[in-house]
Curated annotation (Swiss-Prot):
Gene that encodes it: nadD
Enzyme class: transferase
UniProt record similarity statement: Belongs to the NadD family.
Gene3D superfamilies in alphabetical order: HUPs
Keywords linked to the UniProt accession: ATP-binding, NAD, Nucleotide-binding, Nucleotidyltransferase, Pyridine nucleotide biosynthesis, Transferase
Name the record gives this protein: Probable nicotinate-nucleotide adenylyltransferase
Length: 199
């Protein structure tokens, strides 16, 4: 395999995947044209967030439907779903570097994760394991700099469109028997058919 292949790592709950995720990926491929593939990696449990609702098989099926609408190379990996307990990014990166020794990796994180990145497990080690960390904006055009980080590593900020939606908000809409926007038709049909977020 060509050592020049640059690969993005995009983790998250994806419970469910939505248009915000879509715009992030589109912006990333547009701005980082030398990146040929992105690994989308759903976590089993984010140590800093609430527990997930859907079963792993539901998450994977929704993601398969979600990425089917992209022309770029996006691969879904279930290595974090197979682990028990919290999902730690450092463990995932090191595992990927073992599986794909000739690839170079960049990490995609949201502005919220950028703000608390210094609270992640082995966060300083992560900075040595990836080429770059790209930060996507979710709710604000200007992301406050994290003073714990920028003297150690150059983070790059994507110019993605702001789509203020979260998977948590979408689940709440479903729980309230409201059909939300900002979900692709394929994913929405799957959710409704399988009653994933019904009371």
């Amino acid at each position: 395999m060509n050592s020049s292949i640059l690969t993005g790592i995009f983790g998250g709950s994806f419970d469910p995947p939505h248009e915000g995720h879509s715009e992030i990926l589109k912006s990333f491929f547009w701005e980082v044209s030398d990146c040929k593939e992105v690994f989308v990696i759903p976590n089993r449990q984010n140590p800093l967030k609430e527990e997930k609702i859907s079963l792993p098989e539901n998450i994977l099926e929704m993601l398969n439907l979600f990425v089917s609408e992209f022309s770029q190379s996006i691969r879904i990996l279930d290595l974090e779903l197979k682990r028990s307990g919290p999902s730690y990014t450092i463990q995932t990166i090191q595992e990927l570097k073992t599986i794909y020794p000739n690839r170079k990796f960049v990490l995609l994180i949201g502005e919220d994760n950028y703000s608390n990145f210094h609270k992640w497990k082995d966060w300083e080690k992560i900075l040595t394991e990836v080429e770059t960390i790209f930060v996507f904006r979710r709710f604000s055009k200007e992301v406050p700099l994290n003073s714990h980080l920028n003297s150690l590593f150059e983070f790059k900020f994507l110019e993605n469109p702001l789509i203020p939606v979260t998977s948590t908000d979408l689940r709440k809409s479903f729980f309230q028997s409201k059909v939300p926007n900002l979900i692709s038709k394929k994913v929405l049909d799957y959710i409704l058919k399988n009653k994933l977020y019904s009371k």
